[in-house]
Design a protein with these regions (language model features):
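Bacterial N-terminal signal peptides that target proteins for export
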Residues: 4-26
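C-terminal motif of bacterial Sec signal peptides marking the signal peptidase cleavage site
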Residues: 33-36
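Bacterial signal peptide processing site
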Residues: 38-41
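A short, structured surface patch at a secondary-structure boundary
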Residues: 50, 68-123, 127-132, 234, ...
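Extracytoplasmic substrate-binding proteins
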Residues: 53, 59-60, 126-127, 137-214, ...
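Short helix-initiation/N-cap motifs at beta->coil->alpha
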Residues: 54-58, 109-118, 134, 238-247
Length: 321
């Protein structure tokens, strides 16, 4: 009887031991299975390598060596992305990004100054491109806490625009395309500058809006466009980029030409000269020029279109054959 009990005890002990081993195996297999299920959708996510660069505001940021998903929060930057052949990786844009037509198929994440941070994060971009440092404080820290780099462009003249094209080409792996585009753009700029270089500069008042009256200051890249087109902005020394300006001061400057950026995204807005300026030499001589706002106000590739249109308006005789 004692032997039977001992054998029974040993059998039970062995059975419990096998059961524990089996449970351990099952648990281990389960952990392996669930660990595999919890891996990121991108099997190379943990293999991504980064490098540090400086954006155009002087900030040091880390970007992947290969950037495949990105968002643009400025129409000009969206235009650059497509112009250098990088549109396939654009996963988000602002509601103002309307050119080229393909851009409108990309999901909008709000406007330039108040984008939806939640939507941006959900789209999983590696880099978000913004056009001015003034946008940074609102969302940079939150985006970077989700490992999203924020690259800032900062163009105060046409060379600054070209530099932005070059840098986006670097970040997006499209430098050869960017260089080819820049070669074409610089050639067109050269044609304009050669045509107007011997012409006396035209005094220009650039009316951003009439009520209230806003214009361009020394920090606006459009001030450089006016100069390259054979003009001189009468507000070139005013601090800032888009200063509010008194009608009396504008009239006292006696502009020979008034430029109204209208059409494009602005529609019919800003299509009338401010009341006080109707007594200016520009109006008296019929030198009021309406030019597509999207070409003039966006520091991207089409700024050269704006330069050509502006030069033809200020110096039509320089382009007649």
């Amino acid at each position: 009887m004692a032997g039977f009990l001992l054998n029974t005890h040993l059998l039970q002990t062995a059975t419990r031991s096998r059961t524990r081993r089996l449970l351990n195996v099952v648990v281990c297999l389960g952990l392996i299975f669930f660990a595999g299920c919890s891996r990121p959708n991108n099997p190379t996510a943990n293999q991504t390598t980064f490098h540090q660069i400086s954006d155009e505001s002087g900030r040091t940021i880390s970007v992947p060596d290969t950037v495949t998903r990105y968002i643009s929060l400025a129409p000009s930057l969206t235009e650059i992305v497509y112009a250098i052949g990088a549109g396939d990786g654009l996963v988000g844009r602002t509601s103002y990004c309307n050119y080229p037509a393909e851009a409108q198929k990309v999901e909008a994440v709000g406007d330039t100054l108040k984008p939806s941070i939640e939507r941006i994060i959900a789209l999983r971009p590696q880099v978000v491109f913004v056009s001015t440092a003034s946008q940074l404080e609102a969302f940079t820290n939150e985006l970077e806490s989700h490992h999203i780099a924020v690259y800032v462009t900062d163009s105060h003249d046409l060379e600054g625009v070209f530099h932005s094209i070059e840098r986006l080409g670097d970040v997006l792996g499209k430098r050869a395309n960017a260089d080819a585009l820049l070669k074409q753009l610089r050639a067109r700029v050269g044609v304009v500058e050669e045509a107007v270089k011997s012409r006396p500069p035209v005094r220009v008042f650039y009316q951003v809006s009439d009520e209230p009256l806003y214009t361009i200051g020394r920090d606006a890249f459009i001030t450089d466009l006016v100069k390259r087109a054979g003009g001189v902005s009468v507000t070139a020394d005013v601090p800032g980029a888009w200063p509010k300006y008194s009608a009396e001061s504008a009239l006292a400057a006696k502009p020979d030409a008034i430029v109204l950026p209208t059409g494009g995204s602005m529609g019919d807005a800003n299509s009338n000269v401010a009341a006080a300026l109707k007594r200016s030499p520009a109006v008296a001589n019929g030198h009021v020029y309406k030019i597509n706002d999207d070409h003039l106000s966006r520091p991207g590739p089409r700024a050269v279109d704006g330069l050509e249109e502006l030069a033809h308006a200020l110096h039509p005789e320089a382009f007649t054959k």
